[in-house]
Swiss-Prot record:
Origin organism lineage: Eukaryota, Metazoa, Chordata, Craniata, Vertebrata
Membrane topology: Multi-pass membrane protein
Single GO BP term: response to pH
Chain residues that bind Ca(2+): D34, D35, C74, D341, H342
Protein's recorded name: Steryl-sulfatase
Signal peptide: 1-19
Gene that this polypeptide is encoded by: Sts
Glycosylated residues (UniProt): N46, N332, N458
Amino acid sequence: MLWPCLLALLLSQLNFLCAARPGPGPNFLLIMADDLGIGDLGCYGNRTLRTPHIDRLALEGVKLTQHLAAAPLCTPSRAAFLTGRYPVRSGMASHGRLGVFLFSASSGGLPPNEVTFAKLLKGQGYTTGLVGKWHLGLSCQAASDFCHHPGRHGFDRFLGTPTTNLRDCKPGGGTVFGSAQQVFVVLPMNILGAVLLAMALARWAGLARPPGWVFGVTVAAMAAVGGAYVAFLYHFRPANCFLMADFTITQQPTDYKGLTQRLASEAGDFLRRNRDTPFLLFLSFMHVHTAHFANPEFAGQSLHGAYGDAVEEMDWAVGQVLATLDKLGLANNTLVYLTSDHGAHVEELGPNGERHGGSNGIYRGGKANTWEGGIRVPGLVRWPGVIVPGQEVEEPTSNMDVFPTVARLAGAELPTDRVIDGRDLMPLLLGHVQHSEHEFLFHYCNAYLSAVAWRPHNSSSVWKAFYFTPNFDPPGSNGCFSTHVCMCHGHHVTHHDPPLLFDIARDPRERHPLTPETEPRHGEILRNMDAAARAHVATLEEAPNQLSMSNVAWKPWLQLCLPSKPHPLACRCAGDG
């Protein structure tokens, strides 16, 4: 039995060495889910959702059990994934309340001078494609400049949405502007209503006789506030929820019927068109972010409502794309990677109060915070004949690692004019090294350094120190339900001095902070981590803030519409799909 095992190992190493030579390397299929929790997949312990096709990747490849997103929100995490750099380096981390782009006509986005893995691979002769969600900006100064468009960042083909999927994009899905509604609608209406009532009572009691025009102005102000909000919600969907093929809008607003099937079909078409040339396909699902949707054959079929239906439909789509690889004879020369952009959104509730977020398994917290539930994500890597199937890697890894891994396998040189924070995964996946190359990882909440993780090579521990943590609301819960997601500053957080210390190798639930009494090296560990944090911060160079209020605000001159409806307020029309 020993000789077959040794022969298989030798062949895998020879295949890897051949693939690492200059020239065309393997093909790449990179799959990213949106808001998927690590506890939502069978291969990570879920027993009530059916994910056989994703689980197949775990059986036929490597399962990363401590795979971490570089940020707990969509936009910054995706920027880090594409560039291999912490999002704060590219200005893709917010200093304010809003950490993502909500409007298609915002001027912020992934800066044109950033290098993505798609750009690198184009230089190596690869054909590159993006199917699905982008969420990294569209235009800068004019609607037609497309400075942030996927096509400007190395993708030869783009079919999907330049923004994201939101509740407001689907009729009946509710709205993400509930908290804003309280500030900008309910509060002003209450104040104006109180003023109107006070004037009426004063007039009735004979205490004062306010002029009639004051009544008129107050009523007009109430009508203006209410009307503006209704108009905003009415036009938000067509203005921000649409599909593009390359640089052309094909459907506005997005029709969710058959959407996942269409994305899977486009992915299959891309594979067939490029079967004879090296390719990179980034399949970026709109599942399982709200608004939830599923075709009739999946709707109502899971044990977890609309969320579970979306997970199972996405798994079906993964299976369709993997089957296409098999039919084309491309599976053995294609590295497949699957992940989520961050943890599940635990505060996400449906219009009727039902749970619409996923599961982060045993891990605390979720989307928008740096507890493990917000940043620990699925990580599956398959490459038949090269990566030994059925492995588990427990070392800390990052979604930023995809950038240098893909670059090296494709024979591309990494940029030398900037810091690359990701590390090549292949030595770890092949068993050439036993420890992660990430001795330290830095966890940001927007642009603020929230926590540091340390994996010392002379220990089995993984230390994690929090400089601040979110204030869950209501207290004792596992999220920030009053604000829909946790905030990163001000009264929304609690700062810790000394930092809150955990050993997540022994306490992955982050329930038992260590103290000098429970950990004799407590002070030494924190000093080492603080020194690493200061050294890291010293490498940061100031970058224009792409998520400033001026950059995330809606700009009418950047609004795109179908050619038949050129005015920004007349975008409510469907294309041919």
